[in-house]
Amino acid sequence: MTHQPQQSPQFFLTAPSPCPYLEGQQERKVFTHLVGDKANEINDLLTQGGFRRSQNIAYRPACEVCRACISVRILAGEFEMTRNMRRVWSQNRDLIGRVHKAQPSTEQYALFRDYLDARHRSGGMSDMTVLDYAMMIEDTHVNTQIIEYRRRGPDSFMSAKGDGELIAVALTDVMADGLSMVYSFFSPHMQERSLGTYMILDHIEWARAAGLPHVYLGYWVEGSRKMQYKIRFTPQEHLGPRGWQRFEG
């Protein structure tokens, strides 16, 4: 009889449920729990294999007939901003992002609720309470950071701290080969800033500065309008049957 080591992950399959991206489709997921002292290493390997993390669970689509969800990662070292991206970068030069341990705050939750109510009122996260939010942030056994974006203040050059209200937040896993953007949200009242795009650009710069080759964006679904933004950040790689393949757009 073969015994699995205690640290070996066990995988489970969910029951079918309506797909949140493609109308009329059913989704299933394979998942495992990220616990123990090998959680970081396992999360790195699974993310490189197309998994995503939510709290202490790593999952990936395992649909019976559909393969529309494609894992995407940006090649940070080769990335060049488009003219529009340079405009977004310049427009947000008054912001500063500060990296914290993955700890929730009432200020974060207020912004999170504002974001959901304005942009995802009917989504699966729309009824999340403050306790649900705290679990989303804190329930991690891997190297997870939270980045808070605020306007620069008069002392920001010395203190590396922003000033004023919280404008945007990113929950990010720091891995051996890159940054994985787990979830991000921002003020829905500042559409002219394109804050979602700005946070991705900021993560690319962070990865470059840290010598990390990739920024993982999760899944892209062709034909899904809410996912379309992800393929604007090129060059990038898509995960397929033959491994990671370069994609230029």
UniProtKB/Swiss-Prot annotation:
Q: What's the family?
A: Belongs to the R-transferase family. Bpt subfamily.
Q: Name one GO molecular function term.
A: leucyl-tRNA--protein transferase activity
Top enzyme class of this protein?
transferase
**Predominant subcellular localization, coarse grouping:** cytoplasm
Q: What GO CC annotations are associated with the protein?
A: cytoplasm
Name a Pfam family for this protein: ATE_N
Top-level taxon of the source organism? Bacteria
Q: What is its EC number?
A: 2.3.2.29
Please spell out the taxonomic lineage of the organism that makes this protein: Bacteria, Pseudomonadati, Pseudomonadota, Alphaproteobacteria, Hyphomicrobiales
Task of the protein = Functions in the N-end rule pathway of protein degradation where it conjugates Leu from its aminoacyl-tRNA to the N-termini of proteins containing an N-terminal aspartate or glutamate.
Is the keyword Iron assigned to this protein?
Answer: no
Q: Which UniProt keywords apply?
A: Acyltransferase, Cytoplasm, Transferase
Reactions it catalyzes: N-terminal L-glutamyl-[protein] + L-leucyl-tRNA(Leu) = N-terminal L-leucyl-L-glutamyl-[protein] + tRNA(Leu) + H(+); N-terminal L-aspartyl-[protein] + L-leucyl-tRNA(Leu) = N-terminal L-leucyl-L-aspartyl-[protein] + tRNA(Leu) + H(+)
Name of the protein described by the UniProt record: Aspartate/glutamate leucyltransferase
Q: Which gene encodes it?
A: bpt
**Compartments (UniProt record):** Cytoplasm
Carries keyword Acetylation?
no
One GO BP annotation of this record: ubiquitin-dependent protein catabolic process via the N-end rule pathway
Classification via Gene3D superfamilies: 3.40.630.30
Q: Which InterPro entries match?
A: Acyl_CoA_acyltransferase, Asp_Glu_LeuTrfase, N-end_Aminoacyl_Trfase, N-end_Aminoacyl_Trfase_C, N-end_Aminoacyl_Trfase_N
